[in-house]
Amino acid sequence: MMSARYPRTAAEWTTRIQGVSSERCDLEMLLKDEWRNRIAVRDDDPGVRATRQRDIVVDGREYTALKDALRAADGVSAGALALASLHSVMRAYGHGEQTVAAFVDATATAELKTAAVLPVIVDHIEHTRLTCAEAIRELDETLRRKDSYTRADEVLQRGLFDALLVLAEREVALSELPSAPLVMVVRDDAARGRLCWTMAYAGELFEDTTVAGVLEVVREVLGQYAGRPGDRVAEIELASREQRERLQRWNATDGDFPADQRLNDLVEAAVRRSPDREAVVFGTQRLTYREVDARANRFAHWLLGPGLGVRSQQLVGIFLDKSDLGVVATLGIWKAGAAYVPIDPAYPAERVRFAVGDTGLRGIVTNRHHAGRLREILGAEHADVTVVEIESVLDEQAAADTDGLLSVKPELALGVRDLAYLTYTSGTTGVPKGVPKYHDSVVNSITDLSERYDMRRPGTERVALFASYVFEPHLRQTLIALINGQTLVVVPEEVRLDPDRFPAYIEEHGVTYLNATGSVLQHFDLRRRTSLKRLLLVGEELTAAGLRQLRERFSGRIVNEYAFTEAAFVTAVKKFAPGVTERADRSIGRPVRNVKWYVLSQDLKRLPVGAIGELYIGGCGVAPGYLNRDDLTAERFLTNPYASEQDRARGTNARIYRTGDLARMLPSGEVEFMGRSDFQLKLNGVRVEPGEIEAQATEYAGVRKCVVIAREGAGGGSDRHLVGYYLTEPGAGVTEAELLSFLERRLIRIMVPARMVRLESIPVNVNGKVDWRALPEVDLARPDTGGGAVGSTTTGGVRGELREI
């Protein structure tokens, strides 16, 4: 738990505690909303005292079992049991690997101010490997090191401790307690056969309901330490029984969907309902549902023939820009029983060759415009790959279809659990990861979204096809139009890149439904686009400031979609009705039908409501893993420890996907996004989430967008400093000094960046998300003047940002 050489003086303890701060837990999520990010939950302010208290009492059979457990563990003390429980509870709420508490032994003195204090540091990586009995014994040995105790006035009120644990033999008044926001008082009242645990807290900082929830967890954890001595600490349940039941109810998302239908079946049903309705608009090209279906059927026949000879679930590449041809190619591949791999024609040659080799493609569908470059990219290495020019194939098939038989879909025995497509997501090592997606999971998602977005009335919606072909929003936009008898309006690339022409294009074509990232939409003024009814955001968090900025440009319904390529088509949605301009939290909503989610600890244990953990996704839509990447699959796709007996009987919900997002369950049953785990920072033991700083910065008048990252200082990896980059509204002269001064008034000191650098544009990657690696390096020393804006290293303005997407 600690090294063999224990500190013996207050100075040594201070040095030891400060040395573990980078991996330390942070209890800020227990604070009231208005205090979060403004103070740290530490004993560093003499003016912060416990003003309220709540108690739990362990008595009767529970107390008897507790005392029996202590005797069975070689007579360890109640203090050691309480300390073990406290550290586990702090870890549950603080999301850290090390916790620091002050053990105040008040059993041998009448005055708490003269009580001896022992700092206790627990390393949970080691601690969770022990059995409960071993962990208590180890802490009991720690408490017996009398030469390591120090005086209260030498270590308390110096910001060293996450919480104080007072072991007392009598009732202790609040006025007697040391100054600290959180103090636990434990009293073993053997004469009355009970153990009393009091949680004393600063009433202005903590909600009573929050404290009550913590005490539920204390009771649960205390009982497990006493009642399960042979179990490992990692196996302890960190949520109370009542909370676990509530979490299970919130995951009751099971529902019916057309599980006997493939995606092409859903489109074919729309064709039968409305054969002559306009299906796809691209430039001057307007295709009805009947025409789209006939072309797709002809293409499917060709794919099955000697031209390519596709087999069931064979992968076929699509190397096309957004167009009506892409829609026909996708449907034709599905009708032939195959699956597609989207490849962007704008990709570098190496990226294209990687996808071809990784998937073993034997054929790639392209057009006349891109065919020459594609053949050049494939070269001799992939000379056996057939390049299919789709216009030529469609022309030949139309000419050959004299009896109309080629316009009828091929009769094949196709499965609903067949592969639908394989798409690539970016890899942290720079190597893309292929993710296979199946018909049934996408059918579940797209039919759920159709109902949620009220898209079921044919002929009433016009959906913009805005996203690049290689990203899932492209397919989402295509399907939500075509399975519901709506019109898909393909946005030409030259229009999509123009912040002036695009809004006019929306109005000209009567677009009602637009789906894009917030980074893109912030460039478009949609105020006078009367046709637009729905704005759907995907790929980025919608912050409070982002919502307000969108409301300046759009007054209709806004939906924030939460999605992962590796999991369901869309995992969750959060709706904002027309007129809603504010949001009080960072909720991403609730899971869609047949999707489950779990906020789990480092040991995959369910966490209490309000505690931060990592978000895992289960249920319908979780991919089986990454193509040809067994190492990453084992790391990110895990056996679901919370699959029910019903799940196992049906063969569902067997795996969970580790998202890498930090989150917490809200009392409403919604999940609040807390940032990426790989962007989480610990500075001097305080958890710093850049999104919180970014949100505060955009509250300042004139600041349009902000991103915050950590930069290494001269001292290397341990010497890290926050740097913010911000954009201003046109004409706003927001200086660095002004913005830093504003943040200093709104945030605790450690969360205020060393620098705030104004940029002309913030670089984005091909996904439309901020490209962190492309942000310019800066001198960490603050300049004396506000200075001008720094140019982005990769994009020179609005067009540059949009082109990347």
UniProtKB/Swiss-Prot annotation:
Pfam families: AMP-binding. CDD domains: A_NRPS_ACVS-like. Residues 783-805 are annotated as: Disordered. Keywords: Antibiotic biosynthesis, ATP-binding, Ligase, Multifunctional enzyme, Nucleotide-binding, Phosphopantetheine, Repeat. GO terms for cellular component: cytoplasm. The keyword Cell membrane does not apply. Its EC number is 6.3.2.26. Its cofactor is pantetheine 4'-phosphate. GO terms for biological process: amino acid activation for nonribosomal peptide biosynthetic process; antibiotic biosynthetic process; secondary metabolite biosynthetic process. It is an enzyme of class 6 (ligase). Binds 3 phosphopantetheines covalently. It catalyses: L-2-aminoadipate + L-valine + L-cysteine + 3 ATP + H2O = N-[(5S)-5-amino-5-carboxypentanoyl]-L-cysteinyl-D-valine + 3 AMP + 3 diphosphate + 3 H(+). GO terms for molecular function: ATP binding; N-(5-amino-5-carboxypentanoyl)-L-cysteinyl-D-valine synthase activity; phosphopantetheine binding. Pathway: Antibiotic biosynthesis; penicillin G biosynthesis; penicillin G from L-alpha-aminoadipate and L-cysteine and L-valine: step 1/3. It comes from the Bacteria. Belongs to the ATP-dependent AMP-binding enzyme family. NCBIfam families: AA-adenyl-dom. Each of the constituent amino acids of ACV are activated as aminoacyl-adenylates with peptide bonds formed through the participation of amino acid thioester intermediates. This is N-(5-amino-5-carboxypentanoyl)-L-cysteinyl-D-valine synthase. The lineage of its organism: Bacteria, Bacillati, Actinomycetota, Actinomycetes, Kitasatosporales.
